[in-house]
């Protein structure tokens, strides 16, 4: 038994000692046959592909222990561009010969236990050739485990370290080892790959979970024979597949297939001869990038003399782009860039030195240099600017382009840094900003490539920030923060947070806009470190003491970090107790909009927001749009993997009309990546105030002293910061800020000063002289708009590239000449141009050519083989015109002259093809369309006959199938007939031509696609497509000499009439109806007034078949329903089970039907008849009146035939009637359009529009009128008609086509948004009614013949000026002042008091117990400007109100006496006879209004102060919101934070709040007669606080009588107290003054005095 166990053990050990790793014995040469193939295209056969094949013998021999030689013998290179698999490979003999020397050199490599180590080769072997050797070595790379047959690992190979699966099977009988390994190239620890142009994109992980755009995998199959020291590879087969599709893979994909075969031939004893070349270490098996990084895949250039070739192309670009842009200009520009990339710095400098003095050449070089894409470009720009060779504008343009096009490496980053901190750059503010932003961008791009980039890269910016803070250079600090935001380095979080209020003390001295920039600078950092930024953003958001704008910006940053569910729920919890309405509205709207997000990367956030919104109250949804809002809209298509998102942030701080900040951002999703394409932010702090208020009031010592004396009496007064007029704007592309501008008063003043300077006037005069002499301008702009590349190795060792290029060249040619009559003197004023006849003749020829390429394939410096999509777009739109302007005579004339048009004014061609070419034989490149021509038209006459016979047998069914779909089932047809039907389906061609006005315009569209293979978007794009647009003179009509458009205004309009209009006084019906209408008049004389429906839109439409009794019942019903419309509206709106019926709401007119606008017109029974009376009295106003304006549009033809249109307008002021007649100029054409409008009253206007032959074919009536719906004011617009033209069938066809592209959920969404109900309304009438249910809400009702649509409670952004629309009397003398007043009135906020109830600006009501004889601040400007102040006191004797207004240089007192309101201005009484009163500036007006008096001063911020015996009200303008204080509040919309005392403290007691705004006295002998003061009071009882007896003092001042006075009337007040131990000492003077800053320990009641009586001894 022991012997058996020993034998088994020895057998097991022996079996484990077998070495499966390949081994090559010493002193032997192993000969293999090697074949490698790389082929790209679509997976279907019969289509074109492009590829490369390499065939060779491979010799492997050992030269030392673990060191081997590998040599290729007789290598051959083949190209492929043809129809697969029919066409053969073509030998690239010249390329093989050129590379033969390199291939003949053997390479060395280390190899042990199946693992390839170092690779050594002479320097004479190029990296591309060495990579081909690495492709062979990659086959030998085998990590074989002795104890496992199935396993996986991350294996190093030519393509990186990727996940590899091994399966080993031993065939002991055949003595063979079968090994299979497979690689997942999408699962790599280190994938060798180079990306260009993708630094600004973000990986959308969630998008890629649904499918990768680029997928790759490889399988390796080995057949090996065991040997003593290892295994011998007998055969190795490699198959690798890369698949790319921008859409979902189910739509189809392009693929690149690599195959390798290594077959053992023999073993030779002759060793490989080692050459004398010096072998150097050239890396490992990992692929090394060569010159393919600089090589564009769209063309292959053989560079022999870079400078000479570049100069040749430069000459071509200049020579062939003097007229319209040459169609190959973009391609030549790309060739020029390619040559500059390959050239040395010395060569580029030599080209510049040769052509820098030639403007035509200079700009081509400067536009091409940034596209070099390396540090060479930045160094060139730096050197030339510092040397003074390029201007500031040229440097700025080149720097912006270079920063975004140059690849970021450490050298480039350091170059941009040195440029940003260069002294010469620092002296130019624009260049400094651009370079600082660019430096941040370069750091960001570098960190994308190197995630562990050092913090030292942003250290210089951090130091600059510290210096800016220390020196209080806020503008510089803002720029530095934007640079840090561009860099997005995590090391910047600490320096940024030091500038924020929560984290650093430096923030206290910083302006709000700088703090806002600091918050926004965190956004790009959040993309790399979302968790760290979330911690900062949450703390900012939670700090309720921060300015609301900072908290809302923190909310933006927080949601961009894609917070988890827990954090979103935390925000919702905070929102429940949020008192700031701006923050609450913004956060809730942000969450609400994100709940509808369909973007994959925001799916988790959308789910979290759904939960959070449900936790919150619906009251947030009802907030006005005056509050801050966030809007997010997106759409994402899973099949196409394309999406777009738009976000808009509206940040306000005081519910004003103009927001404080507006940010709009667009984001796109494509092929598993996302990018913030564009973002624009505008800050309007102070702009509205600067536009609407008067210039700053002069520092009048008396005025300022008076106001400051008043506010000094307030307890612990703190003024608000003055809003400095400032506007700022920034623009971001792909998440990087490229430019920003701050505009303040100093900049505006400088611009105005520059505009009025003598140099500016001289510049204007010189420009005018140049125009008079004739000037020609030419501008050419080439641009490499896009270069996106991804390069990675294949198993063969050749690189595969996916790339996208767009290059364009635009040119504008302008020739302009001006003529002035009479000629101006040498020195003239601009006003003289208004009295001059100006003629301008111009010729323009703009042209653009754009080339776009999408490439997939092999790209090296030696050979290219790829499939390519190429799009060419070219537009040329020449024009020649003349314009004449005679302002003095009211004439404007424009003439367009014919030009020789190009063959096509716009052309677009798209084609896809396979191309193969090599550098040794570039002219012999082989191009094959992806869909071969023979594949499209493959048929024979015999097959056509058979097909015809088969179709004839089943014509009906076949035709039905063809009409239903473009996809045809071929199951019933033989396979040889399928291509014929496919060819019929694939080809599409359409031409549409329109001839009008002597011009023939044609649109041509042709398409041949691969949709016959699979009807998806991807296959529809494959093939050839073209769109052509041409505009040419019509051959069937006489030539057009010119087109004229002329406008004549004023008394000379009649002189321009070409066609005299004559209209019959009796309106006749069109032919065929005249007899019938006359017969009706004879037989039924009462039909007109009885049963015929009125053609006027103002009358109700009633059917002629109704009886009088039914009409009477109808009227009774209408009357009853309208009387109860108010209550029914409320009940129906609130009742969930009762649907709203808009027909129940009847419109009651404001005007009387019998009212007329002219004494000449007799009263009639309806307003419609009054319109007809006016119309019939003078059917054509041209018989009595001269035209007010005439417009001529005509063609001047070679045969002198008049063609065109004439528009004349007549105005009859007596009847308020406007008539416009448009007529064809052709004397044989009686077509006209007649429009008559009459203002029947202040509440109604009616218009009739008729057209056709003599305006009799068709007509419509339009009526707009105001009235009431229930108690609410309303406006109604009605459109009625007798006959309308039919809509052409072609229009309906296009409508159906468009409707097919509308997503199915849209109608349902609109149905929920706008409810509708089917009604049988008037068949010839549309009625639109808007009801103002309140100043801020509307009900909208639309009635059409078949349905009624309505929307209730539509919120408005501003209040409706009901009172102001009827009374614009304050400034009747000036229309500008009227508009200004109305605009201010619309957005003003109101504070009022009726009896003892005060309603604040924020609409919060509270009862006020006013102290007698003491002034209280009702409302005042709380900034340091003190533009106005309104005081109120109650007289001690009569207890009547007395208002004092301090504004500008006047002091206004308003009080009542027995006979009415008394007005005093600066102590002088203004009698009623002297009202209205205006101050000397005219900006303040006092006038009677109703039973009281109103003061108006909107330009000072005070819209109105109204005062009568029983009430008063104050209105402040929109731009003062948030800047007021007093009893009326801040007017910031924050009704939860209404009770703010002068110190800024928020109190809960309305009484304490009201008393805090009392102006106390220091003595009872004070002239104000106020006998009270504010002081902290001691609680009358002792309390136990913290287990100690304590004495307590109020932390809020309480109104008390002065010493020596006794209270006559008191009121209870609940206030906070701060407690101290009983034994503690409190200095009465110092302690009580600081007690107001203490914390509240308890709330208790105290007594406040509101009336006092003093003794005579009181001082």
From Swiss-Prot:
<dbReference type="GO" id="GO:0032355">
    <property type="term" value="P:response to estradiol"/>
</dbReference>
<feature type="disulfide bond">
    <location>
        <begin position="1414"/>
        <end position="1564"/>
    </location>
</feature>
<dbReference type="InterPro" id="IPR050733">
    <property type="entry name" value="Vitellogenin/Apolipophorin"/>
</dbReference>
<feature type="signal peptide">
    <location>
        <begin position="1"/>
        <end position="15"/>
    </location>
</feature>
<feature type="glycosylation site" description="N-linked (GlcNAc...) asparagine">
    <location>
        <position position="1089"/>
    </location>
</feature>
<dbReference type="InterPro" id="IPR011030">
    <property type="entry name" value="Lipovitellin_superhlx_dom"/>
</dbReference>
<dbReference type="GO" id="GO:0005829">
    <property type="term" value="C:cytosol"/>
</dbReference>
<feature type="compositionally biased region" description="Low complexity">
    <location>
        <begin position="1090"/>
        <end position="1111"/>
    </location>
</feature>
<comment type="function">
    <text>Precursor of the major egg-yolk proteins that are sources of nutrients during early development of oviparous organisms.</text>
</comment>
<protein>
    <recommendedName>
        <fullName>Vitellogenin</fullName>
    </recommendedName>
</protein>
<dbReference type="InterPro" id="IPR015817">
    <property type="entry name" value="Vitellinogen_open_b-sht_sub1"/>
</dbReference>
<keyword id="KW-0597">Phosphoprotein</keyword>
<dbReference type="InterPro" id="IPR001846">
    <property type="entry name" value="VWF_type-D"/>
</dbReference>
<dbReference type="Pfam" id="PF09175">
    <property type="entry name" value="Vit_b-sht_shell"/>
</dbReference>
<dbReference type="GO" id="GO:0005102">
    <property type="term" value="F:signaling receptor binding"/>
</dbReference>
<dbReference type="InterPro" id="IPR015816">
    <property type="entry name" value="Vitellinogen_b-sht_N"/>
</dbReference>
<feature type="disulfide bond">
    <location>
        <begin position="1391"/>
        <end position="1528"/>
    </location>
</feature>
<dbReference type="InterPro" id="IPR037088">
    <property type="entry name" value="Vitellinogen_b-sht_shell_sf"/>
</dbReference>
<dbReference type="GO" id="GO:1903165">
    <property type="term" value="P:response to polycyclic arene"/>
</dbReference>
<keyword id="KW-1015">Disulfide bond</keyword>
<feature type="domain" description="Vitellogenin">
    <location>
        <begin position="24"/>
        <end position="662"/>
    </location>
</feature>
<keyword id="KW-0325">Glycoprotein</keyword>
<dbReference type="GO" id="GO:0005615">
    <property type="term" value="C:extracellular space"/>
</dbReference>
<dbReference type="InterPro" id="IPR015255">
    <property type="entry name" value="Vitellinogen_open_b-sht"/>
</dbReference>
<dbReference type="Pfam" id="PF00094">
    <property type="entry name" value="VWD"/>
</dbReference>
<dbReference type="InterPro" id="IPR015258">
    <property type="entry name" value="Vitellinogen_b-sht_shell"/>
</dbReference>
<dbReference type="GO" id="GO:0005319">
    <property type="term" value="F:lipid transporter activity"/>
</dbReference>
<feature type="domain" description="VWFD">
    <location>
        <begin position="1389"/>
        <end position="1565"/>
    </location>
</feature>
<dbReference type="InterPro" id="IPR015819">
    <property type="entry name" value="Lipid_transp_b-sht_shell"/>
</dbReference>
<dbReference type="InterPro" id="IPR001747">
    <property type="entry name" value="Vitellogenin_N"/>
</dbReference>
<dbReference type="Pfam" id="PF01347">
    <property type="entry name" value="Vitellogenin_N"/>
</dbReference>
<keyword id="KW-0758">Storage protein</keyword>
<dbReference type="GO" id="GO:0060417">
    <property type="term" value="C:yolk"/>
</dbReference>
<dbReference type="Pfam" id="PF09172">
    <property type="entry name" value="Vit_open_b-sht"/>
</dbReference>
<keyword id="KW-0732">Signal</keyword>
<feature type="glycosylation site" description="N-linked (GlcNAc...) asparagine">
    <location>
        <position position="1627"/>
    </location>
</feature>
<dbReference type="GO" id="GO:0071391">
    <property type="term" value="P:cellular response to estrogen stimulus"/>
</dbReference>
<dbReference type="GO" id="GO:0045735">
    <property type="term" value="F:nutrient reservoir activity"/>
</dbReference>
<feature type="compositionally biased region" description="Low complexity">
    <location>
        <begin position="1119"/>
        <end position="1129"/>
    </location>
</feature>
<feature type="region of interest" description="Disordered">
    <location>
        <begin position="1090"/>
        <end position="1163"/>
    </location>
</feature>
<dbReference type="GO" id="GO:0032868">
    <property type="term" value="P:response to insulin"/>
</dbReference>
<dbReference type="GO" id="GO:0034605">
    <property type="term" value="P:cellular response to heat"/>
</dbReference>
């Amino acid at each position: 038994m022991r012997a058996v166990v020993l034998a088994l053990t020895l057998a097991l050990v022996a079996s484990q000692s077998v070495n499966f790793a390949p081994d090559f014995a010493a002193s032997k040469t192993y000969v293999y046959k090697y074949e490698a193939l790389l082929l790209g295209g679509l997976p279907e056969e019969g289509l074109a592909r492009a590829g490369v094949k390499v065939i060779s013998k491979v010799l492997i021999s050992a030269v030392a222990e673990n060191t081997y030689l590998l040599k290729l013998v007789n290598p051959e290179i083949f190209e492929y561009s043809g129809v697969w698999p029919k066409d053969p490979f073509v030998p690239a003999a010249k390329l093989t010969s050129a590379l033969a020397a390199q291939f003949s050199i053997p390479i060395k490599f280390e190899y042990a236990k199946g693992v390839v180590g170092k690779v050594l080769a002479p320097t004479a072997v190029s990296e591309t050739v060495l990579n081909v050797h690495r492709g062979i070595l990659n086959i030998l790379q085998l990590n074989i485990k002795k104890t496992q047959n199935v396993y996986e690992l991350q294996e190093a190979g030519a393509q990186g370290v990727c996940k590899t699966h091994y399966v080993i099977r031993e065939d002991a009988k055949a003595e063979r080892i079968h090994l299979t390994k497979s690689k997942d190239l999408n699962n790599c620890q280190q994938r060798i790959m180079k990306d260009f142009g993708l630094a600004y994109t973000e990986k959308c992980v969630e998008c890629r979970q649904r499918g990768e755009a680029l997928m790759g995998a490889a399988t390796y199959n080995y057949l090996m024979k065991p040997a003593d020291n290892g295994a011998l590879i007998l055969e190795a087969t490699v198959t690798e597949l890369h698949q790319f599709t921008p859409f979902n893979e189910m739509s189809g994909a392009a693929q690149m297939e690599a195959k390798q075969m290594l077959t053992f031939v023999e073993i030779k004893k002759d060793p490989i001869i080692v050459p004398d070349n010096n072998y150097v270490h050239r890396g490992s098996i990992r692929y090394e990038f060569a010159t393919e990084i600089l090589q564009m895949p769209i063309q292959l250039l053989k560079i022999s003399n870079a400078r000479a070739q570049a100069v040749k192309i430069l000459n071509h670009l200049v020579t062939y782009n003097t007229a319209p842009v040459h169609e190959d200009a973009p391609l030549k520009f790309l060739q020029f860039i390619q040559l500059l990339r390959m050239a040395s710095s010395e060569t580029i400098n030599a080209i510049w030195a040769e052509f820098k003095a030639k403007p035509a050449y200079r700009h081509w070089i400067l536009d091409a240099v940034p596209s070099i894409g390396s540090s060479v470009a930045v160094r060139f720009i730096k050197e030339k600017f510092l040397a003074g060779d390029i201007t500031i504008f040229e440097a700025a343009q080149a720097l912006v382009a270079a920063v975004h096009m140059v690849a970021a490496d450490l050298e480039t980053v350091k170059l941009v840094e040195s440029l940003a901190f260069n002294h010469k750059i620092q002296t130019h503010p624009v260049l400094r900003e651009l370079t600082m932003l660019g430096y941040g961008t370069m750091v960001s791009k570098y960190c994308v490539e190197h995630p562990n980039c050092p913090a030292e890269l942003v250290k210089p910016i951090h130091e600059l920030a510290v210096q800016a803070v220390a020196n209080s250079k806020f503008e510089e600090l803002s720029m530095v923060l934007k640079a840090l935001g561009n860099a997005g380095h995590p090391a910047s979080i600490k320096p940024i947070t030091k500038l924020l209020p929560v984290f650093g003390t430096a923030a206290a001295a910083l302006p709000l806009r700088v703090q806002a920039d600091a918050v926004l600078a965190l956004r790009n950092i959040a993309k790399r470190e979302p968790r760290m930024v979330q911690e900062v953003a949450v703390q900012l958001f939670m700090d309720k003491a921060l300015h609301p704008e900072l908290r809302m910006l923190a909310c933006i940053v927080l949601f961009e970090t894609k917070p988890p569910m827990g954090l979103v729920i935390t925000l919702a919890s905070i929102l429940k107790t949020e008192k700031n309405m701006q923050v609450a509205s913004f956060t809730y709207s942000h969450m609400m909009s994100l709940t509808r997000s369909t973007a994959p990367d925001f799916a988790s956030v959308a789910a979290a927001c759904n939960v959070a919104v449900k936790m919150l109250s619906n009251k947030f949804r009802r907030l006005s749009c005056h509050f801050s809002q966030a809007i997010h809209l997106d759409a994402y298509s899973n099949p196409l993997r394309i999406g777009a998102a738009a976000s808009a942030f509206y940040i306000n701080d005081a519910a004003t009309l103009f927001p404080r900040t507006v940010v709009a951002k667009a984001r796109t999703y494509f092929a598993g990546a996302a990018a913030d394409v564009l973002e624009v932010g505008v800050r309007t702090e102070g702009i509205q105030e600067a536009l609407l208020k008067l210039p700053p009031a002069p520092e009048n010592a008396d005025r300022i002293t008076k106001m400051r004396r008043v506010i000094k009496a307030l307890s612990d007064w703190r003024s608000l910061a003055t809003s400095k007029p400032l506007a700022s704007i920034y623009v971001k592309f792909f998440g990087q800020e490229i430019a920003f501008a701050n505009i303040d008063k100093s900049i505006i003043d400088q611009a105005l000063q520059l505009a009025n300077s003598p140099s500016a006037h001289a510049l204007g005069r010189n420009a005018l002289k140049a125009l008079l002499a004739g000037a020609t301008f030419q501008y050419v702009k080439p641009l490499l708009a896009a270069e996106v590349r991804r390069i990675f190795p294949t198993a063969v060792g050749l690189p595969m590239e996916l790339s996208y290029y767009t290059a364009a060249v635009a040119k504008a040619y302008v020739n302009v000449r001006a003529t002035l009559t009479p000629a101006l003197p040498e020195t003239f004023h601009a006003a003289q141009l208004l009295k001059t006849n100006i003629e301008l003749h111009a010729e323009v020829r703009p042209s653009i050519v754009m080339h776009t390429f999408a490439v997939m394939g092999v790209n090296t410096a030696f050979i290219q083989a790829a499939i390519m999509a190429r799009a060419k777009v070219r537009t040329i739109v020449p024009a020649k015109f003349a314009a004449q302007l005679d302002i003095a005579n009211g004439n404007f004339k424009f003439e367009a002259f014919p030009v020789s048009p190009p063959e096509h004014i716009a052309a677009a061609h798209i084609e896809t093809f396979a191309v193969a070419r090599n550098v040794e034989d570039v002219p012999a490149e082989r191009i094959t369309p992806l869909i071969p021509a023979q594949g499209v038209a493959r048929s024979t006459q015999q097959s056509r006959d058979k097909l015809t016979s088969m179709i004839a047998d089943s014509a009906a069914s076949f035709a039905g199938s063809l009409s239903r779909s473009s996809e045809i089932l071929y199951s019933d047809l033989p396979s040889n007939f399928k291509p014929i039907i496919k060819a019929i389906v694939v080809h599409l061609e359409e031409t549409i031509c329109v001839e009008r006005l002597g011009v023939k315009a044609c649109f041509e569209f042709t398409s041949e696609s691969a949709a016959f293979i699979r009807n998806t978007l991807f296959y529809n794009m494959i093939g050839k497509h073209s769109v052509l647009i041409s505009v040419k003179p019509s051959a069937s009509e006489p030539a057009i000499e010119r087109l004229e458009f002329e406008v004549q205004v004023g008394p000379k309009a009649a002189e321009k009439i070409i066609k005299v209009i004559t209209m019959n006084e009796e309106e006749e019906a069109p032919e065929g109806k005249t007899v019938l209408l006359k017969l009706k008049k004879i037989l039924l004389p009462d039909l007109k007034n009885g049963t015929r429906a009125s053609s006027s839109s103002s009358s109700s439409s009633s059917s002629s078949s109704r009886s009088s009794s039914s009409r009477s019942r109808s009227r009774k019903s209408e009357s009853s329903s309208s009387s109860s419309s108010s209550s029914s509206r409320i009940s129906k709106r609130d009742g969930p089970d009762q649907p709203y019926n808009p027909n129940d709401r009847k419109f009651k007119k404001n005007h009387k039907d019998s009212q007329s606008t002219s004494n000449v017109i007799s009263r009639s029974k309806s307003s419609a008849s009054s319109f007809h009376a006016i119309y019939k009295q003078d059917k054509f106003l041209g018989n009595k009146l001269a035209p007010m304006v005439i417009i001529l549009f005509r063609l001047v033809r070679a045969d002198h035939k008049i063609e065109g249109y004439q528009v004349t307008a007549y105005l009859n002021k007596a009847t308020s009637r406007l008539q416009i007649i448009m007529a064809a100029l052709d004397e044989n054409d009686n077509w006209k359009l007649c429009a008559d409008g009459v203002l029947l009253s202040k509440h109604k206007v009616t218009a009739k529009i008729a057209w056709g032959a003599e305006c009799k074919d068709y007509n419509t009536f339009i009526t707009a009128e105001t009235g009431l719906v229930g108690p609410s004011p309303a406006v109604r617009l009605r459109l009625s008609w007798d006959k309308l033209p039919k809509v052409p069938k072609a229009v309906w066809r296009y409508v159906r086509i468009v409707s097919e592209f509308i997503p199915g959920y849209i109608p349902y969404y609109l149905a929920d948004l706008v409810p509708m109900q089917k009604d049988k309304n008037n068949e010839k009438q549309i009625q639109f009614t808007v009801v103002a249910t309140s100043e801020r809400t509307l009900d909208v009702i639309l009635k059409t013949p078949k349905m009624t649509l309505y929307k209730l409670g539509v919120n408005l952004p501003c209040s409706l000026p009901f009172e102001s629309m009827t009374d614009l009397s304050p400034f009747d003398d000036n229309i500008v002042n009227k508009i200004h007043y109305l605009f201010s009135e619309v957005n003003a906020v109101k504070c009022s008091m009726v009896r003892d109830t005060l309603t604040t600006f924020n609409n919060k009501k509270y009862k006020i117990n006013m102290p007698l004889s003491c002034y209280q601040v009702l409302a005042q400007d709380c900034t340091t400007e003190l533009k106005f102040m309104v005081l109120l006191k109650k007289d001690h004797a009569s207890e009547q109100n007395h208002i004092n207004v301090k504004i500008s240089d006047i002091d206004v007192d308003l009080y009542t006496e027995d006979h009415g309101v008394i007005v005093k201005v600066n102590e002088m009484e203004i009698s009623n006879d002297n009202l209205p009163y205006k101050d000397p500036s005219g900006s303040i007006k006092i006038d009677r209004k109703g039973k009281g008096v109103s003061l108006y001063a909107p330009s000072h911020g005070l819209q109105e102060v109204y005062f009568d015996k029983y009430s008063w009200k104050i209105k402040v303008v929109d731009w003062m919101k948030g800047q007021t204080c007093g009893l009326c509040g801040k007017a910031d919309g924050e009704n939860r934070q209404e009770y703010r005392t002068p110190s800024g403290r928020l109190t809960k007691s309305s009484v304490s709040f009201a008393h805090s705004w009392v102006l106390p006295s220091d003595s009872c002998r004070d002239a104000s007669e106020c006998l009270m003061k504010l002081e902290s009071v001691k609680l009358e009882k002792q309390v136990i606080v913290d287990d100690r007896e304590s004495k307590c003092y109020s932390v809020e001042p309480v109104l008390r009588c002065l010493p020596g006075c006794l209270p006559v009337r008191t009121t209870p007040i609940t206030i906070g107290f701060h407690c101290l131990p009983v034994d503690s000492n409190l200095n009465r003077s110092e302690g009580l003054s600081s007690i107001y800053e203490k914390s509240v320990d308890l709330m208790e009641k105290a007594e406040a005095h509101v009336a006092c009586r003093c003794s005579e001894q009181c001082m």
